[in-house]
Amino acid sequence: MKHTEGFLKIVEDAKTRVREVDVPHTLERLKTGARLIDVREDNEWERGHARGAEHMGRGVIERDIETAIPDHSTELILYCGGGYRSALAADNLQRMGYTNVYSMAGGWKAWKDAAAPIEGE
């Protein structure tokens, strides 16, 4: 998908405040209790997702996160299709007071390219 200039501008702005991690780092952090959150749309999730991930779409994560994960110090790693929407969501969660939030660089594409475990595909 080709992204618009305006969208890329807000993503780049968010990325100045958001820490990114790669797939190998994500896999290591999951072993120690980090929570992996897929922020893609429902139809994307249903076509396949990272094994063990939780689904909270980009349109509802800010509304639902505090009920699902009330501890603002929980380590959260967010991913989307390519790392753009997850950066925006991570930025918002930080603004909500979550202190240990990351965006997975490259998103679902990077996860699949790394042959990391998947389910639902």
Model-derived features with residue positions:
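Rhodanese-like catalytic fold shared by cysteine-dependent sulfurtransferases
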Residues: 1-35, 42-75, 82-121
